[in-house]
């Protein structure tokens, strides 16, 4: 293993372990920890290869990989956050399993952040009266926030970085479809068994609510069109290969297709923000107050 990979390994281990071992320290100093590992790579790189090479590497990664990566996440976050699913769903084993299955399948097209944002609110509401619900959100993280995004570059951020490097848009779909369905099927079956056992322990009052007629309401449906536009924009940027570039100095050139893609993504995010009712977005955790949060508190 190359010594150059050690700072990256250290960063991953810090993200995985420090929140568990020293949560207070991590909460207040995670930026400093990240900066430490960045410098642990950059300083030796500048000494060994020269300052210009190190600066070129940083600018290349930042402008051609990190910025497009963040812009895609930002757009999916804003657009998916404008879709609100509400109703009187009760978190029965069948309902929870169906919601997890839908979220898993949609995550590759909404993105794992987008699918999680769309489904977490109805999932919380459906299970807020249950006394045994921790496992629901553990499997939600496994399926919707992780495995579900394995089929397209839209689904999982690292796959999008691979797409920026030249990996075909549909390569992951052909390669990962069978493994994804196999693993998801096992987890969904396991979840249903666990949730059925937990449901049998619930009070009669909770079970009685499941007999009511289901009513589901979806607001902000126009954002689905924006999501399709996001998918088409990313796909087109991979198909449209143009030689035109913008020189940025230090040997870095910004491809025209990437620039057009990023501008369109930002425009779609702004359109979604302007055309979606603010009341829908106020219910998201990133715009809500502590009182609204407490109303959705889980019985853990």
Go through the PLM ranges and name each one.
Residues 13-26, 76-91, 124-127, 191-200, ...:
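C-terminal ends of transmembrane helices
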Residues 227-300:
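Transmembrane helical segments that form the transport core of multi-pass membrane transport proteins
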Residues 94-147:
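Hydrophobic transmembrane alpha-helices that form the pore/transport pathway of multi-pass ion
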Residues 20-24, 42-65, 74-92, 105-118:
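Transmembrane alpha-helix boundary signature
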Residues 1-4, 8, 39-43, 194-227, ...:
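Intrinsically disordered, low-complexity non-transmembrane regions of multi-pass membrane transporters
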Residues 1-4, 25-34, 54-68, 169-179, ...:
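Interfacial loop-to-helix junctions that mark the boundaries of transmembrane helices
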Residues 7-18, 37-48, 73-81, 181-193, ...:
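Hydrophobic core segments of alpha-helical transmembrane domains in multi-pass membrane transport
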Residues 132, 151, 171-212:
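Juxtamembrane and boundary regions of transmembrane helices in multi-pass small-molecule transporters
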